[in-house]
Amino acid sequence: MTLNSSPIKRLDNKPPIWLMRQAGRYLPEYMAVRKEVKNFLEFCYDVDKATEVTLQPIKRFGFDAAIIFSDILVLPHALGWEVDFKENIGPLLKQFKSKEDFKYLQDNSNDKLEKVYEIVKKVRKELPKSTSLIGFAGSPWTVMTYMLEGKGKQDFRVSKKFIYENKDLAKELLNFITEKTIHHLINQIKSGANIIKIFDSWAGILPEEEFKKFVIEPTKKIIKSIKGYFPDIPIITFPKGAGLLYEKFLEEVPTDIIAIDPLIPLEKMKLWSNKVTVQGNLDPVILLTNKKIIKEKIHKILSIMENKNFIFNLGHGILPETPPENVEFLVKCIREYEYK
């Protein structure tokens, strides 16, 4: 089963499987490599180590796609913006506050992003041909929120106040990030990625008018630009937390695949699969429970999504405390499931 076609095809009635953050802290082999590197960003730019951890979940679980080990904040970092990752705290960034701050952003990225593209090339070379390779970037809006807030996981009042009060400057920053995101994704495709994903982790914090301006419009621009060069590359979008605005997103954004968060009803996911391929949406916390619950939840999703354009995934990233044996059980449940 592969994720190589557009739209993604099913084989033997079984959906393809991969998991967000499948290369990560829940794997002991990942932690062994992580301990060898001083900081997280250095890890993201280390060609050999990033390649190794990208391949780890493929070797262990046989997922149908690998996703490059990287981070959405390598883009602003490579463009000269101050970004750091603190243990047990997360990302810390210089705050973008005024037009003057554009002087800290370079028009051309330094050689840091070249390391990312080397990782893509090396992974593609070592990955089984039948396994797809997903390149990715953060959405312009989500990357912008980190730059405006100076850190992650806030209530986003700083970002929202900024875009309400500084419409022209907010648009200028959004456009800058959008253009750089397009180049970053295209370069990943040129390096060997055959699927692209746009992570919009904070799409769900915006009201409808701002959602259109800061989520829908830049995503449309990115997709149009990529398709101009690579019309057959499938693009996955993920407007996490968008709720009812998922439908507006689907109406306006020409996405090939849409990732669904756990709060969207399965019947909606089933309905949307008539228009696009849907991906999701198991709650990651389910993998912290027991096999009985895991099997029950997986079977419910599979029964509803039978014969639909569907990729099995979580509704968000796998949690660090997830037992690897539960992930192994998830894969087993999906591959052994018998449709009625």
From Swiss-Prot:
InterPro entries: UROD/MetE-like_sf (IPR038071), Uroporphyrinogen_deCO2ase_HemE (IPR006361), Uroporphyrinogen_deCOase (IPR000257)
Residue sites binding substrate per the record: 21-25, 71, 146, 201, 316
Assigned keywords, A-Z: Cytoplasm, Decarboxylase, Lyase, Porphyrin biosynthesis
Gene3D superfamilies in the cross-refs: 3.20.20.210
Pfam families, per database record: URO-D
E.C. number(s) listed in UniProt: 4.1.1.37
CDD domains the record matches: URO-D (cd00717)
Residue(s) at site: Transition state stabilizer: 71
TM annotation in the entry: none
PANTHER family named in the record: METHYLTETRAHYDROFOLATE:HOMOCYSTEINE METHYLTRANSFERASE RELATED, UROPORPHYRINOGEN DECARBOXYLASE
Subunit structure: Homodimer.
Similarity comment: Belongs to the uroporphyrinogen decarboxylase family.
Protein's name according to its UniProt entry: Uroporphyrinogen decarboxylase
Organism: Rickettsia bellii (strain OSU 85-389)
